[in-house]
């Protein structure tokens, strides 16, 4: 599955008339929280994301971040690879499907997921399926653009996880873009965070710089 999809994506990018863009971001997080669970033991983390997107809707990308897990002194880096297709149905509706592989240094095992995301206006629903364990994760979010206008970004997120030992969670995220072409973004997220097996309320912040270049 992985080799077939990556081969298809790479073949798309070798088309002579191919046009698209390179985009991504680099950022600093006061806590790296993923699906309601800290991946850095509540400590700061630096991340990078880069993506090549074709005008046809196909894309490939990578995500890298610092991680730290309780009882594991060997794992410090996460590097993910993903590929997919984003179908723009209309100005307000899109369907994104793809594959992602999560890899770590140290002793943490890599794993793979398939995902599908539906965006309708401010609503977004995404479902991930673990290829090896058949576990599923779903996330529903809504952006309150009509309420806050261009003053700042306001987003409500609810995650549902059927992985044993994992809880559902809810987060409220407030963000603001600034600087030249609004390339910088600062956000604060309030919600639940699982740390060493205990769930508690948490607040964490992120500062990112976004970039893009067409070709």
Regions found by a protein language model. Give the residues of each.
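Outer-membrane beta-barrel proteins
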Residues: 16-215
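Bacterial N-terminal signal peptides
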Residues: 7-16
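Positively charged n-region of N-terminal signal peptides that target proteins for export
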Residues: 1-4
């Amino acid at each position: 599955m992985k080799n077939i999809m990556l081969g298809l994506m790479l073949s798309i990018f070798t088309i002579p008339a191919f046009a698209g863009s390179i985009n991504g971001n680099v950022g600093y997080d006061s806590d790296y929280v993923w699906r309601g669970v800290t991946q850095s033991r509540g400590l700061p983390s630096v991340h990078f994301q880069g993506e090549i997107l074709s005008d046809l809707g196909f894309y490939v990308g990578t995500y890298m971040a610092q991680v730290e897990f309780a009882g594991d002194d060997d794992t410090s880096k996460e590097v993910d690879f993903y590929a997919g297709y984003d179908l723009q149905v209309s100005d307000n509706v899109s369907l994104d499907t793809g594959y992602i592989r999560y890899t770590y240094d140290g002793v943490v095992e890599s794993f793979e997921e398939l995902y599908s995301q539906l965006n309708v206006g401010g609503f977004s629903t995404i479902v991930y399926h673990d290829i090896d364990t058949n576990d599923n994760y779903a996330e529903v979010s809504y952006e309150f653009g009509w309420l806050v206008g261009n003053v700042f970004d306001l987003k409500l997120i609810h995650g549902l996880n059927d992985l044993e030992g994992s809880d559902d969670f809810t987060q409220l995220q407030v963000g603001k873009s600034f600087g030249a072409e609004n390339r910088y973004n600062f956000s604060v997220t309030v919600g639940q965070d699982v740390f060493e097996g205990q769930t508690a309320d948490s607040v964490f912040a992120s500062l990112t710089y976004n970039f893009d270049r067409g070709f």
